[in-house]
Swiss-Prot record:
Gene name as annotated: pckA
Record lineage: Bacteria, Pseudomonadati, Pseudomonadota, Gammaproteobacteria, Alteromonadales
Keywords tagged on the record: ATP-binding, Cytoplasm, Decarboxylase, Gluconeogenesis, Lyase, Manganese, Metal-binding, Nucleotide-binding
Obligatory cofactor(s): Mn(2+)
Gene3D superfamilies: 3.90.228.20, Phosphoenolpyruvate Carboxykinase, domain 1, Phosphoenolpyruvate Carboxykinase, domain 2
Protein name: Phosphoenolpyruvate carboxykinase (ATP)
């Protein structure tokens, strides 16, 4: 240590961390009691700056490529040491936390941050255990040093900032970036690598449970409605983003929520609205002169966020766990306006659409994404976070669906009646009515209509939903144009799917090009 004047603050409470964050000028208190912090130029994830150390213990199991980029082991050691030296003469904040609400499948993690607000974020999003590391597992370490500037020529990084995961040494290094979401997503990637080896499917999904103990999962990319739809006043929340599905049940990987705030309203999202209070971290939310958050303001970024612990949600499952799911919902945001609002999937179709991960980048969480909306295919509804080959996760999904008998649905939260710019987006009440019917089991044995081009079965009637909306061709004025757009979408699916080596039963389960 340098001159001895620096301090290591260990396991501070929410109140202490907020107090220190304010005293250190890291953020401001808002009118609703939340702490608001700005992240500077990086207001989302930086996929180009994310690496995994290439080393013998994990190398053969990782799908190397543009998502999982290799980093040299000796370069990692040198950079880790440099960052530790950088922090040696600074105050740091440390907590002993866990990732995974499962006695068997948790990972203990020691989180060290340069900023108090980053430590508060970690304590909100990870699990603060009553007894740390009860099973005495080897401990992971995260270091987050936003003040450290990487030098690519010296450090081997892509830019002045980096996120590097080292499986052999159980270390995660974050340097040069303030966007706190990188911390949670790096540990999600860690669990996504570790869990399949134990027969557990890690999932980029939200989960809730009814009064009768029936679990529903919602898969989807950022902005498709995972957080909004799982925050259901009639049900109990397990979690909003990351879960594991083991034989016998599902468990939350996290201890908090990271909700998008853009256009947040008390009317449409009361559960999230009420969770934003003292102890919550608001990221890049603009406030007025009275410190009242303006959730419509996207001047800093579309990707404004609220990070709060699950304790801020009244209706939640206290143990962060649930039974295996009766219903599994794949949320897709279709910008072409072609997909129906809901379809029932066979297990082969479920594997096909899980591997495809078709959706749109709406208010994308990635750096450099503007408000422009484009369609994308993101494997397993979360390609940026899955280190193993996609087939590993698809196989596990089919296994779990089959052994429990879960029914899978494809729900379009995007456009109808025309593409983005011409058609209109399904409103939240319509999607909620569809989800209510799924959750109650009403759609399990309902009469369906077959859409040949899309190779999908759609219900002919759903309580509380205008039947005209159910078959998308009925919402388009120009039926010829609909057929053209449907053909184009089917071709896109087919072209994207060519990279997968899977049985014909899965290959043929997609749209008919």
């Amino acid at each position: 240590m340098a001159d001895g004047s620096n301090r290591e603050y260990l396991n501070l409470s929410t109140g202490q961390l907020v107090e220190l964050a304010l005293a250190r000028g890291e953020g401001q208190l808002t009118a609703n009691g939340a702490l608001v912090a700005k992240t500077g130029e990086r207001s989302g994830r930086s996929p180009n700056d994310r690496f995994i150390v290439k080393e013998p213990s994990s190398e053969a199991d990782i799908e190397w490529g543009p998502v999982n980029k290799p980093f040299k082991a000796d370069a990692f050691t040198a950079l880790w040491n440099r960052v530790e030296a950088f922090l040696a003469d600074k105050d740091t904040f440390v907590s002993n936390l866990e990732v995974g609400a499962s006695k068997e499948h948790y990972q203990p993690v020691k989180v060290t941050t340069q900023y108090a607000w980053h430590q508060l974020f970690a304590r909100n999003l990870f699990i603060v255990p009553e007894e740390f590391n009860a099973a005495d597992k080897p401990v992971w370490q995260i270091i987050n040093a936003p003040g450290f500037e990487c030098v690519p020529e010296r450090d081997g990084t892509h830019s002045d900032a980096t996120v590097i995961i080292n499986f052999a040494e159980r270390k995660v290094l974050l340097a040069g970036l303030k966007y706190a979401g990188e911390m949670k997503k790096s540990m999600f990637s860690v669990q996504n690598f570790l869990l399949p080896a134990k027969g557990v499917l890690p999932m980029h999904c939200s989960a809730n449970v009814g009064a009768d103990g029936d679990t529903t999962l919602f898969f989807g990319l950022s902005g498709t409605g995972k957080t909004t739809l799982s925050a259901d006043p009639k049900r109990f929340l397990i979690g909003d983003d990351e879960h594991g599905w083991a034989p016998g049940g599902v468990f939350n990987i996290e201890g908090g929520c990271y909700a998008k705030c853009i256009d947040l309203s008390q009317k449409n999202e009361p559960v999230i609205w009420d969770a934003i209070r003292f102890g919550t971290v608001l990221e890049n939310v603009v406030t007025d002169e009275n410190r009242v958050p303006d959730y419509t303001n996207s001047s800093l970024t579309e990707n404004t966020r609220a990070a709060y612990p699950l304790e801020h949600i009244a209706q939640r499952k206290l143990d962060n766990c649930g039974a295996e799911p009766h219903a599994v919902v794949f949320l897709t945001c279709d910008v072409s306006g072609v997909l129906p609002p809901v379809s029932k999937l066979t297990k082969e179709q479920a594997a096909y659409h899980f591997l495809s991960g078709y959706t749109a980048k709406v208010g994308s969480t990635e750096m450099g994404s503007t408000a422009a909306i484009q369609s994308t295919f993101s494997t397993c509804f979360g390609a940026p976070f899955f280190p193993r080959p996609a087939g590993v996760y698809a196989e596990l999904l089919m296994k779990r669906i089959e052994s429990f008998g879960s029914q899978v649905y494809l729900v379009n939260t995007g456009w109808t009646g025309g593409p983005h710019g011409i058609g209109k987006r399904f409103d939240i009440p319509t999607t909620r009515a569809i989800v209510d019917a799924i959750v109650s089991g009403e759609l399990k044995d309902v009469e369906t209509e077959y859409l040949e081009k899309l190779n999908l079965h759609v219900p002919v009637a759903i309580p509380g939903v205008d039947s005209k909306l159910l078959n998308p061709i009925n919402t388009w004025e120009d039926k010829v144009q609909y057929a053209e757009f449907a053909q184009h979408l089917a071709d896109s699916f087919k072209a994207n799917f060519e990279k997968y080596q899977v049985p014909d039963s899965i290959k043929n389960a997609g749209p008919n090009a």
